[in-house]
Amino acid sequence: MKRLPILLILGMLGFVSCSRPAQESLKPRIVVMTDIGPAEVEPDDNESAVRLMAYADRFEIEGIITTIGWNCDPYPEEWAVYLERVIDAYEVDVQNLMKRSGQKGFRTPEMENATQELGYWPSADYIRGRTVMGSRRAGIGVIGPDNDSPGSELLIRLADEDDDRPIWLCSWGGANTFAQAVWRVQQERTEAELKRFLRKFRLYTITDQDMVWAMRMNRAYSSHQWLRRDFADDLLLVWDESAWLNQNELGKANWDKYERFIQGKGEMGKVYPKFLWGVEGDTPSFLNVMPNGLNDPDDPEQVGWGGCHRFGLSPDGETSAWTNWQQPLKDISNAYEHKFYPDEFNDFAARMQWADTGAGNLNPVVVLDGNTGIKPLEIDARPGETLTFDASRSYDPDGDSLTFDWWFQEFPGQALYPDIDQSSGAKVRVTVPGTPGAYHLVCEVHDDGPFRLPAYRRIIVKVP
């Protein structure tokens, strides 16, 4: 289905490649499971779908699966038309969005179904071809021989592909479709093969929505509990109970900005509905994977735009997951979610301006000690050592001026942090404490153009 030989002409994109792209230049792989529906029932999934399409150059969208959630059981098949409306709007706006990266056209279907590099905008037909129906009934009770779906079959095919990148499952509704795929593999393959299957995936759930709203506290009803209980050793599962709530509430508090900068901007802005319960509550599931240099999502303790999480007891009181519902982590994650909200909104608003007009601001590029990547830099240091970091070669594609802010991420139980000299300059000196540990320094950069766009780079200072 994917991963065709790369020794092909890339077609109309405007450049030619004759070898497999470097791993860091490839997009992260994601699959969305959404209970999208009418705006008067489920507006936030429509909103999150618009934002996802505005970032289609940052994610390899392997699938969008329509499925059950708090508002529906069974999932009405006709609701999938609301996802189609967003994709249709993207088909119009992508002609402007491609101007952000100088893209002149789309690759052939065969090449679009191979790997995609960061910056490539896929065609609407590519996304349509990966939009399928998943489980239409909720709960662990329906998992079994009669619950296979195009969505569960897609997940199995994706896991079987020759691709080392993990697949992030963004659960906007229930993850019942994935649970069915796990069950099917468990029935038909060896234990070792099941483990390999599970280790291909990372699951980020927006609370637990594998049931209707009235049953939301019945954790045992959900297939998520089965996944956490039986597969915790092999499946990275994030159960968020902070970022989605803040996304909802901060969006409501700032709705005037959505009316001004999001709604009506391009065709996608025209299908971005007014909130009902909250704004884009599902968006943190893919913001967590955003390849912007702030975090490595494979380490959920690293804070990103989707919050931060620590492995421990989940809200059901029985199973464990990467979560943030307990103190002190809940307050820490909450503070960072408030801190980053202006950045992630402004970034979105700037992209919607591109969708509308084909022009706009571009993000700065962090160059840290001569390195332009986005993966965290790891530095070994001695207790008491002074380290120097230089981001002075960072630049803005539009020629905007840059400001710098350096800070250490707060972790529960970490009492001492290195001292930073000149935390607002392009160069900093850091004095390492005598206490062993890993200290996470973030270089945060903003331009002074419209929407004051951000860029980040993380440095992990390891002290033995």
Regions found by a protein language model. Give the residues of each.
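Bacterial N-terminal signal peptides
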Residues: 6-14
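Short, solvent-exposed loop/turn segments at the edges of extracellular beta-sandwich modules
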Residues: 446-452
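N-terminal acidic, glycine/proline-rich low-complexity segments
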Residues: 20-388, 394-416, 427-429, 438
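Short beta-strand segments within Ig-like beta-sandwich modules, predominantly Fibronectin type-III
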Residues: 419-424
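Extracellular and select intracellular beta-sandwich modules with Ser/Thr-enriched
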Residues: 452-459
